[in-house]
Amino acid sequence: MNLIKQFEQEQIKKLTQGKSIPNFRPGDTVKVNLRIIEGANERIQAYQGVVIARANRSISSSFTVRKISHGKGIERKFMLYSPLISSIELIKKGVVRRAKLYYLRNLQGRKAKIREKIFSKDNQ
């Protein structure tokens, strides 16, 4: 293993210490709890939506979450190993046949709904 990959693996271990990252895929509904720092105050803000894309690039891994807020679609991209993410919760598992769900941007209402796969929280 070359030095860069070894260094990245060490950094990933350090960043995930004390946190559990669930095994989620595009189509799953997740709740991302973010640490927001405003001056001297620090608070946790939840962002819940459907994962429409995931990029697995070692320490630069990221995922995009889409939610509908006040009738408008909002997408936000998160770095998987960011220290600002306090936790990620898997809410629902979806059944999709694509790795990137960008087509959901053009759909509205029931057409944008994703079938749900039944799972137990213990088994994830």
UniProtKB/Swiss-Prot annotation:
Stated role: This protein is located at the 30S-50S ribosomal subunit interface and may play a role in the structure and function of the aminoacyl-tRNA binding site.
Similarity comment: Belongs to the bacterial ribosomal protein bL19 family.
A molecular function (GO) term: structural constituent of ribosome
Gene Ontology biological process terms in this record: translation
Gene that produces this protein: rplS
InterPro entries, per the entry: Ribosomal_bL19, Ribosomal_bL19_CS, Ribosomal_bL19_sf, Translation_prot_SH3-like_sf
Assigned GO CC terms: cytosolic large ribosomal subunit
Domain of life: Bacteria
Gene3D superfamilies membership: 2.30.30.790
Keyword entries, A-Z: Ribonucleoprotein, Ribosomal protein
PROSITE patterns linked: RIBOSOMAL_L19
Name the record gives this protein: Large ribosomal subunit protein bL19
NCBIfam families linked to this entry: rplS_bact
